[in-house]
Amino acid sequence: MQNQRNIILAVVLSLALILGWDLVMTRFFPPQVEAPVQTATQTVQGPSGEQIPADAPDLVRDLDAALASAGRIPIDAPEIAGSINPVGARVDDIVLKTHRTSVARDSGPIRLFAPHGTQRQHFARFDWVGQGVKVPDAQTEWTVTSGDRLTQETPVSLSWDNGQGQIFGLTFAIDEHYMLTVTQTLTNRATGSIAVRPRGIINRTSVGADRSTFNVHSGPIAALDNTVNFDWDYSEVTENNGQVNLPGRPDWVGFTDIYWMSALIPQPGLATQASFAEAGRDRYAAVLLYDTVTVPEGQMVTYTSRLFAGAKESNVLRAYEAEGVARFGLAIDWGWFRFIAWPMWWLLTHLFNLVGNFGLAIICLTIIVRAIMFPIAQKQFASMAAMRAVQPKMKALQERYKDDKPQLQQQMAKLYKDEKINPLAGCLPIFLQIPIFFALYKVLLLAIEMRHEPFYLWIKDLSAPDPAKILNLFGLLPFDPPGFLGIGVLAVILGLTMWLQFKLNPAAIDPVQQQIFMIMPWVLMFVMAPFAAGLLLYWITSNILTLGQQKYLYSKHPQLKAQAEKDAADRERAATRDKKA
């Protein structure tokens, strides 16, 4: 029992440190964000030394003014809306129709792409690199040749004549979700052949981007040679002389936030290179560059790339993966426990489809998890009962061999063998629950399906902390308590259920451990307060089920129940003596 208590204590303290560290650092030591300032026009190096225009803005542009520029081609698809700027053929205006900025009914849709020069600029464009050939650039004014609105049924085509015998073309198509197909053509009508390289670029600012942490990646992302690369963040690109040439063959490359992503996907079967580059102050580029192609006189070449710009919905990403976008489903960083997290997400979403509420789905998921763990819990209680039964023998051995530790260990091992006791059996449920807890934590943190999903009463968003804070009288006072001081109703219920759970257990032999386990529920109440309401709901439900499970198992092992009642009586007598003293 003492070893088990020590392990529990170590696990709980480790959880508190791991889960609480990032919250404290985010709250009290936020990264400094600098507003964009005027910069000089510059270029940066791409793969093989190709120049990437930095597209440096003059001053920060007003978003509405930028979107009011003439000639924009509207985008109207089932999941996204926006427009394409014919200047530079930039896809620079995308909002996500089905995802809102907040739970408020009048909140607007999430803006993913914004025009060049605006505070949150984020856009994509497709061009060519060539020596001795006039190629389109960021300032090229393209002509619309077909289509006046990009929809799922109607693609849009643009062209540009460089005046030297080459005609460049772009055709945009869009599907029912978040994928644009971009076809680049080049017709050579001049005398002699030319050599060019097709290219796609995503340019975005890091201002306002989600913060990359030890357990959630935000920033540059790429799939290379059968793996998804989460190694780089924005600052590391800057520290690497502003340039990262990615090794291997890219399946896709782009930028990710917690819920959103933009990515370039090359035409299958063609050799490409990928890189990340600093493209100005607080601005970065993801570049996809095809190998050089020679276009003979009178010939045309065609390249078809894809641009993903949307929400990281697991079903959608996996559907694209099934269509040939390798490892696209792994763009959601489920972490070390992906083998548990994804099945848990799958089960949670299917339970939601059955019950119609993600809070109820979490409760159902918790019941299923506890039911699966119940046989192990039975073995744990049986082990605890056996350990209690041999405790007098253990104490006798400890007294007899107190000066001979090797002999004591041998005799204890013999006692365990003779009594058929495994002292580690009681720890197994704890170790099994750690990956389950972290997997659910990742699911609630990363699954966009949970975003803005309500429960009942005051819980309007299960992916956000409990809004009913005690220190501001549940919202009556006009301030938001900081971090771990923002104790909500769910955190208090969590502390109470955990306290009851510890109270039902037989007391630890060590008085210091007894004190630690008395205060541990309230420590965890503060630590868990800033976490998602859905995670607290899971833990509360698990605690309540554990209380019922303990009651049942105590009926099967009356010696443990008697010991727990004796310990409780001893604690009450000790508390009474302390008060009198």
What is each stretch, according to the model?
Residues M1-Q38, I84, Q184, V196-A223, ...:
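Helix-loop-helix
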